[in-house]
Structure formats: structure tokens, C-alpha cells
Swiss-Prot record:
GO molecular function, a single term: organic acid binding
Organism of origin: Columba livia (Rock dove)
SS bond list: none
Descriptive protein name: Hemoglobin subunit beta
Binding site for heme b: 63, 92
């Protein structure tokens, strides 16, 4: 994947302002609420019975932060995203059997959350760079499935 200097700048400038704990929790909660079938991968998380329960669930918050923290590894390693996610791809494929489509859904949700959080700063050019990034990350995570 080739990243232009502008794309890299747009991604890193937004990433530098992201509250990983808040945005991560919000992204995972939104995934579980908007796409309820994804909840089956989180049966050990306790109460996921309603949007309020999901949003307030400490396990959802903790895992959301973990997910977005690892997303930060992609931002730091834009030129080696495949390598960066090789082990996570293996874990999600071989052990957890996560549907790779879920990675794409979560990426799209992350873009929505960034747009909501950053408003006018999240320009169409910025969105394009982030959309490319979440696609590349989703593809890297799904790599073990191919």
C-alpha cells in the first residue's frame, strides 16, 4: 500500500488528538449495538442486553480501548500494516473464528466516530485517508483467512 505524504499527515494529525479509551469504547459499543450479531464473540463480557448496558459495560470499554490501542500500531507502522497485524490476524482467525467482515464494520464505525468527534477538522480528504487506513487494517486482520 502506498501512502502519500498528505495521507500520512492527515492520519497522524487526527490520531494525535484521539482519546483512545473513549473512542475505543464508543466504537466497540456502537459495533455491538448497530450489528447485534457481533455480540456472539463477546459472550464472556456479561450484560449486553441493551444499548445502555453495552455502553456502560466495563468489559466493552476495556476491550474497545485495547482494540483502538492496537489500531495506533497501524498509524505508527503505515508501511508495514500486514506485519503489524500478523499475530492478531492469526488469533482472530484460528482461535476466535471472527467473521472478517466484522473488521470492515468496525473500521467504518471508527470513521463515523472520528467524524462525530472532530467535525470540520475531519475533512473529506481526511475521511478518504482514514477510510483507506481502516480498509488496509481490516484486510491485514483478515489475511489469515485467505
Amino acid at each position: 500500500v502506498h501512502w502519500s505524504a498528505e495521507e500520512k499527515q492527515l492520519i497522524t494529525s487526527i490520531w494525535g488528538k484521539v482519546n483512545v479509551a473513549d473512542c475505543g469504547a464508543e466504537a466497540l459499543a456502537r459495533l455491538l449495538i448497530v450489528y447485534p450479531w457481533t455480540q456472539r464473540f463477546f459472550s464472556s463480557f456479561g450484560n449486553l442486553s441493551s444499548a445502555t448496558a453495552i455502553s456502560g459495560n466495563p468489559n466493552v470499554k476495556a476491550h474497545g480501548k485495547k482494540v483502538l490501542t492496537s489500531f495506533g500500531d497501524a498509524v505508527k507502522n503505515l508501511d508495514n500494516i500486514k506485519g503489524t497485524f500478523a499475530q492478531l490476524s492469526e488469533l482472530h482467525c484460528d482461535k476466535l473464528h471472527v467473521d472478517p467482515e466484522n473488521f470492515r464494520l468496525l473500521g467504518d464505525i471508527l470513521v463515523i466516530i472520528l467524524a462525530a468527534h472532530f467535525g470540520k477538522d475531519f475533512t473529506p480528504e481526511c475521511q478518504a485517508a482514514w477510510q483507506k487506513l481502516v480498509r488496509v487494517v481490516a484486510h491485514a486482520l483478515a489475511r489469515k483467512y485467505h
